[in-house]
Amino acid sequence: MDLDTASHMLTATVRTETVPMARVPWNEPGIIGRVLDAGALAVVIPMVNTADEARQAVESCRYSPVGSRSFGPSLPNNRYGSMYPVRANDEIAVIPMIETREALANLDEIVSVPGVDAVYIGPADLSIALGLPPGMDHEAAVFNDALEAVVAACHRHGVVPGVHANPSIAAKRYEQGFRMITVGYEIFAAQTALRGDGKAARAAIADAI
């Protein structure tokens, strides 16, 4: 979705108990600033491959003196008042994505960057980087060794390991040590609902014949 749509969705959460999280399209300060100004409390940043790129992501999410974020969040101010800059620096979660061989090679450096709260594996991109078909799960040792390496690095540095999954493998990922597990997205949810509705309709018609 585009930034305007994402901003409207984030705005809708401001007076709720929801903790809004946004995945931005790239590690770019202006894009990150827009979703934060709209009310995001966690930002997932794709294709972070080095410690320097992780530091850039953190700085984009933090106000001075620990970052370079520009002040302009009228909506978060409505929720948190004049203390928003202080609370934002303390509470907004910065979540780089691990999706490449380069990121795997730099794991310890990435997760040890101050301000990185979690990392999040994009399994499809990681699969491709490892020479596998895009997917959420593989039997190949190279894929499972990579997952294990991410969990181990996170545990060494007190960072939350995260991964995208689906309902059928969520328990498996939890057993592997992941503690932030997503199990769907809007297109997947719509497809699942439509399949269920179609199945129910066909069953009802069959019963009526």
PLM regions with names:
Residues M1-I209:
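Expand to "…catalyze enediolate/carbanion chemistry for C-C bond making/breaking, isomerization
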